[in-house]
């Protein structure tokens, strides 16, 4: 039986993507070769990379607007240092919003390159809310934020307006909701939350912001070099890029980001409504900052933990325990999560009510 996968990542992908990818593992494009063994320079894979890069920009509404899409390696953790390496001037500074664990990790890397101003932080309340009302220094080389926080279940609902370049880590909510993506100058997202398997990272960057900070950048960390090499400066993660393309095609076939967002809202509303209705549970995040991707919640009485755990496991649910730094539970309801699976969890929460 296929389980209801609530893992925060690597995470659920569409069933049809699994099916197409599994066929490609045996015979890709009737080539007689597996996708795992084809040359990354072959015309078949070059076509995959080109379409993936183009489709990413199309879905984000950024085609013809001076942006380039790249599929790189190293995850968002490498992007944490690539941003300052490519954008922070010598003796410059950057502004960061500290809204969670991954924002903190990005800040740590930025401090290696220059002054790093933390414009706002929710660390004082274990990151249960998104900081607001902060000021971004006009003389900063860029502003960095994390759109969604997988661990704490918070999500930025309104992004600040500023005249300096805006960098955003969208690893866990990329392609999940409509935004004016032209307000961002650099977006990066590890594939393993909402787009594909671990092994590749989508980078979307406005070309005009590159090459201005005067630094000598190592080749593998230089966005401009990756653009010039058409995302093939070194051997890319062929399979991860291919599966990401299949997922992007699935999003387009669904009706694009607008259609996906509508379903995501319905799933989140269904689950949060039960959390708020059921006296046995409480949400972990500030209500106005609740994530539509990672729903964090707690039992009001820890004595019910054993019973609840037995119920959701018996229902075929996987990956529900919360991160160790928060505890409780975390239901990751990414794009590919069907609303039927969310209903299963809601039914389990109601069943607990009748048992205690």
UniProtKB/Swiss-Prot annotation:
Main location: cytoplasm
Residue positions where N6-(pyridoxal phosphate)lysine is found in the record: 193
Transmembrane segment boundaries: none
Localization of this protein: Cytoplasm
Record's catalysed reaction(s): O-phospho-L-serine + 2-oxoglutarate = 3-phosphooxypyruvate + L-glutamate; 4-(phosphooxy)-L-threonine + 2-oxoglutarate = (R)-3-hydroxy-2-oxo-4-phosphooxybutanoate + L-glutamate
Highest taxon listed in the record's lineage: Bacteria
GO molecular function: O-phospho-L-serine:2-oxoglutarate aminotransferase activity; pyridoxal phosphate binding
GO terms under biological process: L-serine biosynthetic process; pyridoxine biosynthetic process
Keyword hit for Transferase: yes
Residue positions binding L-glutamate: 41
Cofactor note: Binds 1 pyridoxal phosphate per subunit.
Cofactor(s) of this protein: pyridoxal 5'-phosphate
UniProt keywords, alphabetically: Amino-acid biosynthesis, Aminotransferase, Cytoplasm, Pyridoxal phosphate, Pyridoxine biosynthesis, Serine biosynthesis, Transferase
Coiled coil (UniProt feature): none
GO cellular component: cytoplasm
InterPro entries: Aminotrans_V_dom (IPR000192), Aminotrans_V_PyrdxlP_BS (IPR020578), Pser_aminoTfrase (IPR022278), PyrdxlP-dep_Trfase (IPR015424), PyrdxlP-dep_Trfase_major (IPR015421), PyrdxlP-dep_Trfase_small (IPR015422)
Record-listed E.C. numbers: 2.6.1.52
UniProt binding sites for pyridoxal 5'-phosphate: 76-77, 102, 150, 169, 192, 234-235
Listed pathway(s): Amino-acid biosynthesis; L-serine biosynthesis; L-serine from 3-phospho-D-glycerate: step 2/3; Cofactor biosynthesis; pyridoxine 5'-phosphate biosynthesis; pyridoxine 5'-phosphate from D-erythrose 4-phosphate: step 3/5
Quaternary context: Homodimer.
Entry similarity comment: Belongs to the class-V pyridoxal-phosphate-dependent aminotransferase family. SerC subfamily.
Role according to the record: Catalyzes the reversible conversion of 3-phosphohydroxypyruvate to phosphoserine and of 3-hydroxy-2-oxo-4-phosphonooxybutanoate to phosphohydroxythreonine.
Protein name in UniProt: Phosphoserine aminotransferase
Annotated source species: Flavobacterium johnsoniae (strain ATCC 17061 / DSM 2064 / JCM 8514 / BCRC 14874 / CCUG 350202 / NBRC 14942 / NCIMB 11054 / UW101)
Gene: serC
């Amino acid at each position: 039986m296929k389980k209801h996968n609530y893992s925060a990542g690597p995470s659920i992908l569409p069933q049809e993507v699994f099916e197409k990818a599994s066929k490609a593992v045996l015979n890709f494009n009737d080539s007689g070769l597996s996708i795992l063994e084809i040359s990354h320079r072959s015309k078949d894979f070059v076509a995959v990379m080109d379409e993936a890069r183009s489709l990413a920009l199309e879905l984000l509404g950024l085609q013809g607007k001076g942006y380039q899409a790249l599929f790189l390696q190293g995850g968002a953790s490498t992007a944490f240092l690539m941003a300052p390496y490519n954008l922070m001037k010598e003796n410059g500074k950057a502004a960061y919003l500290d809204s969670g664990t991954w924002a903190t990790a990005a800040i740590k890397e930025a401090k290696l390159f220059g002054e790093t101003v933390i414009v706002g932080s929710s660390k004082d309340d274990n990151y249960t809310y998104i900081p607001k009302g902060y000021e971004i220094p006009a003389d900063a080389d860029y502003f960095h934020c994390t759109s969604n926080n997988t661990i704490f279940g918070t999500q930025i609902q309104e992004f600040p307006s500023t005249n300096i370049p805006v960098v955003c880590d969208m690893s866990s909510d990329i392609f999940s909701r409509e935004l004016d993506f032209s307000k961002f100058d650099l977006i990066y997202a590890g594939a393993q939350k909402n787009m594909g398997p671990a092994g590749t990272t989508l980078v979307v960057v406005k070309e005009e912001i590159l090459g201005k900070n005067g630094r000598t950048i190592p080749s593998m960390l230089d966005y401009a070099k990756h653009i010039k090499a058409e995302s093939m400066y070194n051997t890319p993660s062929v399979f991860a890029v291919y599966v990401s393309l299949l997922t992007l095609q699935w999003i387009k076939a669904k009706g694009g980001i607008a259609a996906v967002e509508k379903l995501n809202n319905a799933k989140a509303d269904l689950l949060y409504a039960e959390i708020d209705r059921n006296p046995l549970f409480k949400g972990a995040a500030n209500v106005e900052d609740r994530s539509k991707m990672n729903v964090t919640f707690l039992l009001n009485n820890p004595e019910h933990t054993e019973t609840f755990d037995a119920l959701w496991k018996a229902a075929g649910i996987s990956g529900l325990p919360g991160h160790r730094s928060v505890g409780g539970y975390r239901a990751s309801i990414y794009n590919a999560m069907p609303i039927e699976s969310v209903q299963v969890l809601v039914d389990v929460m109601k069943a607990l009510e009748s048992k205690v």
